[in-house]
């Protein structure tokens, strides 16, 4: 495993943006370099402690899904290698295994969330209204129940430090037009269903996930950002799944659970994480990679 990377520092390429986890660089006019760091965020706050190897795991899982699902929708992956984008070997070394060179696409201002199970904010919404983000559901469902059919519950993309806001389909139609909004919904549901079926055969339930999409110059929809990672999805072990209880996750649940024990107001700056929480979180990310792809 390489050294933990909290922040990338490239001098050969212009930095466009630092997100919660990813650093984005321009590679000419037509490509981007996505560097997935070991930063971890919780409650929309970036924490000061890295999770070693997390960036490499997220990159491998995303690349796996991009290729696995490209029959459903084109994706951002480009033919350019990392060596072509960053020719200097010393500058390139910290980026190996955690970087993707991608096409530069016009990102849509929508988080395309698909939920297959009743958990998190969806469960809270259901308890109050009998619906999830305006989608009516049968009465009598329990926490973590599988939904009769996956539902599409889009949200707006928030700036770093802000919270994404759930919106209805009509709002997304106003943002991008009804035809494109419908295509995003249909594509997100198709991606989720295909991925959930594959993952379940490997012992992982994908309870929900978040996709992002972009358009090329011809207006063709592409899957961008990350795909079905433990950061953008809830992964549960299928062998211990029981409706009525909140299942453990293959993600930063250890981080969230630890932070809930602290007297912290969930605003920046975030607290340091203890070594045992870091270790358990690292192991969970690696287990997700192994189960899904067979790689370690």
From Swiss-Prot:
Cross-referenced NCBIfam families: PRK13961.1, purC
UniProt KW keywords: ATP-binding, Ligase, Nucleotide-binding, Purine biosynthesis
HAMAP family: SAICAR_synth
Enzyme Commission designation: 6.3.2.6
Lineage, broadest ranks: Bacteria, Pseudomonadati, Pseudomonadota, Gammaproteobacteria, Chromatiales
Name under which the protein is recorded: Phosphoribosylaminoimidazole-succinocarboxamide synthase
Cellular component per GO, a single term: cytoplasm
Reactions it catalyzes: 5-amino-1-(5-phospho-D-ribosyl)imidazole-4-carboxylate + L-aspartate + ATP = (2S)-2-[5-amino-1-(5-phospho-beta-D-ribosyl)imidazole-4-carboxamido]succinate + ADP + phosphate + 2 H(+)
InterPro entries the UniProt entry points to: SAICAR_synt/ADE2_N, SAICAR_synth, SAICAR_synthetase_CS
Coiled-coil features, chain-numbered ranges: none
Domain of life of the source: Bacteria
GO BP term, pick one: 'de novo' IMP biosynthetic process
GO molecular function (one): ATP binding
Record keyword Ligase present: yes
Similarity section: Belongs to the SAICAR synthetase family.
Pathway: Purine metabolism; IMP biosynthesis via de novo pathway; 5-amino-1-(5-phospho-D-ribosyl)imidazole-4-carboxamide from 5-amino-1-(5-phospho-D-ribosyl)imidazole-4-carboxylate: step 1/2
